[in-house]
From Swiss-Prot:
Mg(2+) 2 binds at D347, D427, E429. The active site is at K354, R431. Keywords: Aminopeptidase, Chaperone, Chloroplast, Hydrolase, Magnesium, Metal-binding, Plastid, Protease, Stress response, Transit peptide. Its cofactor is Mg(2+). It is found in: Plastid, Chloroplast. Residues 1-42 form a transit peptide. Expressed during floral development. Expressed in healthy and senescent leaves, cotyledons (emergence from seed coats), pistils, sepals, petals, stamens, and floral buds (at protein level). It catalyses: Release of an N-terminal amino acid, Xaa-|-Yaa-, in which Xaa is preferably Leu, but may be other amino acids including Pro although not Arg or Lys, and Yaa may be Pro. Amino acid amides and methyl esters are also readily hydrolyzed, but rates on arylamides are exceedingly low; Release of N-terminal proline from a peptide. GO terms for cellular component: chloroplast. It comes from Solanum lycopersicum. This is Leucine aminopeptidase A2, chloroplastic. Mg(2+) 1 binds at K342, D347, D367, E429.
Length: 571
């Protein structure tokens, strides 16, 4: 494989480059350095995770392929761009960076220097390709001896999302050219503080790693990523940037776990498999994470009637209630937090069956996207090991199926706090499982709760496929989560908690119904969940129905992991 040495690109000879129900109503209860960047797939032979190791027969006899965990060595270096050697150099450029003088030459010093080394070829080629630095633009240029990728950052590059996109574009260019060694630089770092440079480097690393990941476990044939190393140029060196890139490594590992859990079909990832994955996380980080898995009988003892009613029909795949607890052995006071994830490993809709092309029943494997994010965050925090928090990770895992034992429309179920719910629609099941999960979380003595759920289609009508909706009566908590999301490059928008809508959720025979009659479905869903949270506990609900899945890429995104981890670390 050829190496790219910018200072000799034009002079070097041409060389070829190598081109991832029980209704428990009767149970009333009382109210230059570098380091390796390992990415271990869910099915990795080395990791022996349950999704790969599942022993029993599965529908269709499908079993994931084995794959080795790829490693990317990441280094933050002060090497000048024109002196760097490797296969592919990716440069992030804003529209201002692409400004030219009266002779059509670059005004930007770095691009000017690079163009000079290439005898004007960079300027000519970028003009020919109409590259102007607009967001979403990218052009891959091949020169004698190597490749340069120009990536547009828009009018300015001030957000983690911009740098994620730069890293992803670099990863895509590396994949298409089968590059092994790549570098990423910014055309200009003017106006970036030292802290901003560190955060930018971390975001670029995140983009490259997640952009390089391909979930090929269920393909009969697949190509492995050739990428071996990433150099981040011009953003500084030293222990602070090293720590930040290492942080990105741990978060990416959690995101990839989340993606793999959601991508895996329901005949592979069952409630039992989610429980085993939780056990694996606890085993890996046994000094800071403990695990408690409750089966149906134990949940019945706790009077979790809402959760068990949803699970009743899936007799072949019984429910498992997952509780992980992260706590370091330090004596300092710890803020008690809970992360609660909706864990429907498949949602048929029950007797209110999802029908028609618009129902997207074939994608209901992703109805455990909230649970996947919670488990991904647990994995990441097991590595990061924050000392001032105690975090409870809670998932009420089950399937929503149809059988003679199943929950019926019109049934009345009783949650573990004694509140009764008339089930007017079995396809509004996630909130029933979350009701008992939220009660359980409050019983752990936590101060704050975030729940994540693919709860409603209504949130996608309001915000589209890329933005999560945040619901909370607490302004302070809302600000915390919004700030964490912005720092992580994940999109969410605070939505109103319109209390007057609760009137439409009242039942004539029970305390409430589980689905509102019409518009404002995302709001009424959040108001329903609020009934099961203690008033003294700060609580925020994230409706992530849109961003957990990318229709464009036909893949899970791992949404929520980054925001959850960042929020925990800020407490």
């Amino acid at each position: 494989m050829a190496t790219l040495r910018v200072s000799s690109l034009f002079a070097s000879s041409s060389s070829s480059l190598h081109s991832n129900p029980s209704v428990f109503t009767k149970y009333q209860s009382s109210p230059k350095w570098a380091f390796s960047f390992p990415v271990t797939p869910l099915c990795s032979k080395r990791s022996k995770r349950i999704v790969h190791c599942i022993a029993g027969d599965t529908l269709g006899l499908t079993r994931p392929n084995e794959s080795d965990a790829p490693k990317i060595s990441i280094g933050a270096k002060d090497t000048a761009v024109v002196q760097w050697q490797g296969d592919l150099l990716a440069i992030g450029a804003t529209e201002n960076d692409m400004a030219r003088d009266e002779n059509s030459k670059f005004k930007n010093p770095l691009l000017q220097q690079l163009d000079s080394e290439l005898n004007g070829l960079l300027s000519a080629a970028s003009s020919e390709e109409d590259f102007s630095g607009k967001s979403g633009q990218s052009v891959n240029l091949r020169f004698p001896g190597g490749r340069i990728s120009l990536v547009g950052l828009g009018s300015s590059a001030s957000s983690p999302t911009s740098y994620h996109s730069l890293g992803q574009a670099a990863a895509a260019a590396a994949r298409s050219s089968q590059a092994r060694n790549i570098a990423v630089a910014l055309a200009s770092t003017d106006g970036l503080s030292a802290e901003s440079k560190i955060n930018s480097a971390s975001a670029i690393a995140t983009g490259v790693v997640l952009g390089s990941f391909e979930d090929n476990r269920f393909r009969s044939e697949s190509k492995k990523s050739t990428l071996e190393s990433l150099d981040i140029l011009g953003l500084g060196t030293g222990p602070e940037i090293e720590r930040k890139i290492k942080y990105a490594e741990h978060v990416c590992a959690g995101v990839i776990l989340g993606r793999e859990l959601v991508n895996a079909p329901a005949n592979i990832v069952t409630p039992a498999v989610l429980a085993e994955e939780a056990k694996k996380i606890a085993s890996t980080y046994s000094d800071v994470i403990s695990v408690n898995i409750l089966d149906a009988e134990q949940c019945k003892e706790l009077k979790m009637g809402a959760y068990l009613a949803v699970a009743a029909a899936a007799t072949e795949n019984p429910p498992y209630f997952i509780h992980l607890c992260f706590k370091t052995p330090t004596k300092e006071r710890k803020t008690k937090l809970a992360l609660v994830g909706k864990g429907l490993t498949f949602d048929s809709g029950g007797y209110n069956l999802k029908v028609g092309a618009g129902s997207r029943i074939e994608l209901m494997k992703n109805d455990m996207g909230g649970a996947a994010a919670v488990l991904g965050a647990a994995k990441a925090l097991g590595e990061i090991r924050p000392s001032r928090v105690e975090v409870h990770f809670i998932v009420a895992a089950c399937e929503n199926m149809i059988s003679a034992e199943g929950m019926r429309p019109g049934d009345i179920v009783t949650a573990s706090n004694g509140k009764t719910i008339e089930v007017n629609n079995t396809d509004a099941e996630g909130r029933l499982t979350l009701a008992d999960a939220l009660i359980y979380a409050c019983n752990q003595g936590v101060e704050k709760i975030i729940d994540l759920a693919t709860l409603t289609g209504a949130i996608m009508v309001a915000l589209g496929p890329s933005v999560a909706g945040a619901f909370t009566p607490n302004d302070g908590l809302a600000n915390e989560v919004v700030a964490a999301a912005e720092a992580s490059g994940e999109k969410l928008w605070r939505m109103p908690m319109e209390e007057s809508y609760w009137e439409s959720m009242k039942s004539g025979v029970a305390d409430m119904i589980n689905l509102g009659p019409g518009n404002g479905g995302a709001i009424t869903g959040a108001l329903f969940l609020k009934q099961f949270v203690d008033e003294k506990v700060q609580w925020l609900h994230l409706d992530v129905a849109g961003p957990v899945w990318s229709d464009e890429k036909k893949n899970a995104t791992g949404y929520g992991v980054s925001t959850l981890v960042e929020w925990v670390l800020r407490n």
